[in-house]
């Protein structure tokens, strides 16, 4: 366990955060933050799905088989961004699960 210095105003405002102790409160803050990041990823993923009319796995297949012009700058950029959002979504889900396990058990 590590010790950290926290400003008094932060400690005072922790009263508004759900949790029975500081560890639970910090964990809840992290889950809340990860959930916001997850929502942003899912919104970005949805925009790509709406733009291309398919999910990322299907788009990847179309990209790999040449059904879409993989050398077009916009498509290549979209592929990389979409892939990044999918990876980030997975990391956020994993982090949320881990944090919730800490609260529950």
Language-model regions: role of each:
Residues 1-63, 69, 94-105:
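Small, basic N-terminal interaction modules of short regulatory proteins
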Residues 67-76:
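Charged, acidic
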Residues 75-105:
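Short, compact, well-ordered microdomains
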